[in-house]
UniProtKB/Swiss-Prot annotation:
Domain of life: Bacteria
A GO-annotated cellular component: cytosol
Annotated transmembrane regions: none
Protein name, entry field: Small ribosomal subunit protein bS20
Described purpose of this protein according to its UniProt entry: Binds directly to 16S ribosomal RNA.
Length: 89
């Protein structure tokens, strides 16, 4: 339990930050899910369009350090490879 005024304030701030970060992580997961659905549907044009939007979301959230920059880079790379594989298939 937070005993000092400073600790109580930090606890309040942490709670607000946690809920805000959870919202952003949810937005990220939704963006990635949309790309994967377009890939599974086999629609390369739609997948590329949604991929561009999800890259913007990934970069924005990685800049805020909500997810690690390497995780964002890895996710972008894997999704991009899957979209390129659609052209070959």
């Amino acid at each position: 339990m937070a005993n000092s005024a400073q600790a109580r304030k930090r606890a309040r701030q942490a709670d607000g930050q946690r809920s805000h970060n959870a919202s952003l992580r949810s937005t990220l997961r939704t963006a990635i899910k949309r790309v994967r659905q377009a890939i599974e549907a086999g629609d390369k044009a739609a997948a590329q369009g949604v991929f561009q939007q999800s890259v913007a979301v990934l970069d924005r959230i990685a800049d805020k350090k909500i997810v690690h920059k390497n995780k964002a880079s890895r996710t972008k790379s894997r999704l991009s490879a899957q979209i390129k594989a659609l052209a070959a298939a």
